[in-house]
């Protein structure tokens, strides 16, 4: 890991840009994994649209309740924990994630930017007002179930997940904040993202264009073509642990 450690040696501002691969090691299913029987006939992406919710609200709401329970039972892994540890080394670390779970926050990262929203923050499908669920409204069997969405206390519209569905735009303020962080970082470390979902996939390119070093961490080679771009193939927990170890050693040597 000498090369990435050397690339990060003079960095002060680091952006973690994370995707599904970082949470997969905590047991969070990805689109490639087998779904529970109730939803097995469906492509998960087909359930993540406003039209799907209009046509089958109980199917879609039940799907998201099951996913939320899956996240609640999961624990942050070493790849989530490394970012607060890097803060302790003196780096200014920001997290921009495509994930809708809260594992970064539970690992100790603060002010996480969720490009695609969050499972923990439902809202009204009609008036878009944020809502909170009671514990009984979050109950769902292990095998999943069709569940009619609760109603908004304000307008009686159906509650929907507070995530960005396919065909919907990212919240302008969220995207603006993410781009600002990326344009001003010294290094961007992309972890577990395929780099195909736009506009999120543009962030590494924005970082490169702004002169930052970009390090890709993935179980498959997603390509690194620019002079200031590195590709590290491996599990996020393993690769990031080695990077952190190298940086810690470097800091200790500098202080010694």
Swiss-Prot record:
<dbReference type="GO" id="GO:0017136">
    <property type="term" value="F:histone deacetylase activity, NAD-dependent"/>
</dbReference>
<dbReference type="GO" id="GO:0005737">
    <property type="term" value="C:cytoplasm"/>
</dbReference>
<keyword id="KW-0862">Zinc</keyword>
<dbReference type="InterPro" id="IPR027546">
    <property type="entry name" value="Sirtuin_class_III"/>
</dbReference>
<dbReference type="InterPro" id="IPR029035">
    <property type="entry name" value="DHS-like_NAD/FAD-binding_dom"/>
</dbReference>
<feature type="active site" description="Proton acceptor">
    <location>
        <position position="116"/>
    </location>
</feature>
<dbReference type="Pfam" id="PF02146">
    <property type="entry name" value="SIR2"/>
</dbReference>
<dbReference type="GO" id="GO:0070403">
    <property type="term" value="F:NAD+ binding"/>
</dbReference>
<comment type="function">
    <text>NAD-dependent lysine deacetylase and desuccinylase that specifically removes acetyl and succinyl groups on target proteins. Modulates the activities of several proteins which are inactive in their acylated form.</text>
</comment>
<comment type="similarity">
    <text>Belongs to the sirtuin family. Class III subfamily.</text>
</comment>
<dbReference type="InterPro" id="IPR003000">
    <property type="entry name" value="Sirtuin"/>
</dbReference>
<dbReference type="GO" id="GO:0008270">
    <property type="term" value="F:zinc ion binding"/>
</dbReference>
<feature type="binding site">
    <location>
        <position position="127"/>
    </location>
    <ligand>
        <name>Zn(2+)</name>
    </ligand>
</feature>
<feature type="binding site">
    <location>
        <position position="67"/>
    </location>
    <ligand>
        <name>substrate</name>
    </ligand>
</feature>
<feature type="binding site">
    <location>
        <position position="64"/>
    </location>
    <ligand>
        <name>substrate</name>
    </ligand>
</feature>
<keyword id="KW-0520">NAD</keyword>
<feature type="binding site">
    <location>
        <position position="124"/>
    </location>
    <ligand>
        <name>Zn(2+)</name>
    </ligand>
</feature>
<feature type="binding site">
    <location>
        <begin position="98"/>
        <end position="101"/>
    </location>
    <ligand>
        <name>NAD(+)</name>
    </ligand>
</feature>
<dbReference type="GO" id="GO:0036055">
    <property type="term" value="F:protein-succinyllysine desuccinylase activity"/>
</dbReference>
<feature type="binding site">
    <location>
        <position position="155"/>
    </location>
    <ligand>
        <name>Zn(2+)</name>
    </ligand>
</feature>
<keyword id="KW-0963">Cytoplasm</keyword>
<feature type="domain" description="Deacetylase sirtuin-type">
    <location>
        <begin position="1"/>
        <end position="250"/>
    </location>
</feature>
<feature type="binding site">
    <location>
        <begin position="192"/>
        <end position="194"/>
    </location>
    <ligand>
        <name>NAD(+)</name>
    </ligand>
</feature>
<keyword id="KW-0808">Transferase</keyword>
<feature type="binding site">
    <location>
        <position position="236"/>
    </location>
    <ligand>
        <name>NAD(+)</name>
    </ligand>
</feature>
<keyword id="KW-0479">Metal-binding</keyword>
<protein>
    <recommendedName>
        <fullName>NAD-dependent protein deacylase 4</fullName>
        <ecNumber>2.3.1.286</ecNumber>
    </recommendedName>
</protein>
<dbReference type="InterPro" id="IPR050134">
    <property type="entry name" value="NAD-dep_sirtuin_deacylases"/>
</dbReference>
<feature type="binding site">
    <location>
        <begin position="19"/>
        <end position="39"/>
    </location>
    <ligand>
        <name>NAD(+)</name>
    </ligand>
</feature>
<dbReference type="InterPro" id="IPR026591">
    <property type="entry name" value="Sirtuin_cat_small_dom_sf"/>
</dbReference>
<feature type="binding site">
    <location>
        <begin position="218"/>
        <end position="220"/>
    </location>
    <ligand>
        <name>NAD(+)</name>
    </ligand>
</feature>
<dbReference type="InterPro" id="IPR026590">
    <property type="entry name" value="Ssirtuin_cat_dom"/>
</dbReference>
<feature type="binding site">
    <location>
        <position position="152"/>
    </location>
    <ligand>
        <name>Zn(2+)</name>
    </ligand>
</feature>
<dbReference type="GO" id="GO:0036054">
    <property type="term" value="F:protein-malonyllysine demalonylase activity"/>
</dbReference>
């Amino acid at each position: 890991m000498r090369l990435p450690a050397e690339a990060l040696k003079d960095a002060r501002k680091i952006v973690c840009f994370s995707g599904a691969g970082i949470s997969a090691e905590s047991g969070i299913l990805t689109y490639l994994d087998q779904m529970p029987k109730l939803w097995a006939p469906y492509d998960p992406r087909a359930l993540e649209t406003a039209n799907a919710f209009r046509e089958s609200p109980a199917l879609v709401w039940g799907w998201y309740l099951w996913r939320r329970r899956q996240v609640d039972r999961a624990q942050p892994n070493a790849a989530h924990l490394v970012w607060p540890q890097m803060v302790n080394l003196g780096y200014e670390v920001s997290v921009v994630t495509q994930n809708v779970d809260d594992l970064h926050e539970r690992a100790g990262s603060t002010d996480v930017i969720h490009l695609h929203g969050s499972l923990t923050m439902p809202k009204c499908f009609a008036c878009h007002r944020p809502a909170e669920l009671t514990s009984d409204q979050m109950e769902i069997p292990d095998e999943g179930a069709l569940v009619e969405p609760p109603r908004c206390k304000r307008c009686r519209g159906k509650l929907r997940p507070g995530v960005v569905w396919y065909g919907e735009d990212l919240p302008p303020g969220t995207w603006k904040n993410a781009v600002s962080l990326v344009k001003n970082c010294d290094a961007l470390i992309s972890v577990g993202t395929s780099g195909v979902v736009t506009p999120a996939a543009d962030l590494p390119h924005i970082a490169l264009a702004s002169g930052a070093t970009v390090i890709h961490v993935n179980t498959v080679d997603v390509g690194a073509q620019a002079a200031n771009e590195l590709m590290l193939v491996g599990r996020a927990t393993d690769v990031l642990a080695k990077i952190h170890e190298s940086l810690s050693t470097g800091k200790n040597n500098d202080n010694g």
